[in-house]
Amino acid sequence: MQRQLGHKRYQPIWEMMHKLRSVMGERDSKYNLEGTIELDEGYFTRNNDSAKDEDEDENQKRGLGSQRKSKVLVMVESEKADNPKPSQKSRKCGHLKMKVITDLKGETLKSAVECSVSPDTTAVMDNFASHSTVEKAVSKSERQTVRGCNAPKVLPWVHIAISNAKSLFTDMYHGIKEEFLQEYLNEFCYKFNRKYFGDRMFDRLVIAAVSYKPTFEHKLYNGRANCG
């Protein structure tokens, strides 16, 4: 973006992009997911802030419990496909939401779901213990035992979304700090939800940018929220 705009300094462009990502999140927060949704958690490796953090990692957990992984609740509208071909998914997807969460406690997940889906939603999810609390936020739930072999059939679009987001962040940004992860997820979901817009996506973003105030603030320019 800096090269395309011909701007000499990186910092203003970096902040502008984060404010646009913030606006994307504000726009998508105005609607709730409906119908049947797939729900699961994703774990995103975050970038270390310093060499000191890398040294501390030697004494930290590995895998899903690692302190270097940010927890993300992923929800996507999903309906059973009518007579899918062998090469097609068993479910077809709608809109997507991804929310960074502080922990995997039932109340934390329930609160995030209540802010993201309609009360009459049906949630398809695995048998993770905290999901029993999530059931209180929806009208109906379908909990199944999900293992590696059947995950693509039970929760196909959740896992596709997580995999694609991880690949994008790794290839394009080479690591993201936790404090900025939600902004990048906002952009990923905004584009995913408008994948059929084509050239109209830019026009819709311009409308959103003048309709919503970005919530992103940073130390640049004294933390002012307005684009400069």
Task: Identify the role of each PLM range.
Residues 1-228:
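Residue-level recognition of single "structural anchor" positions
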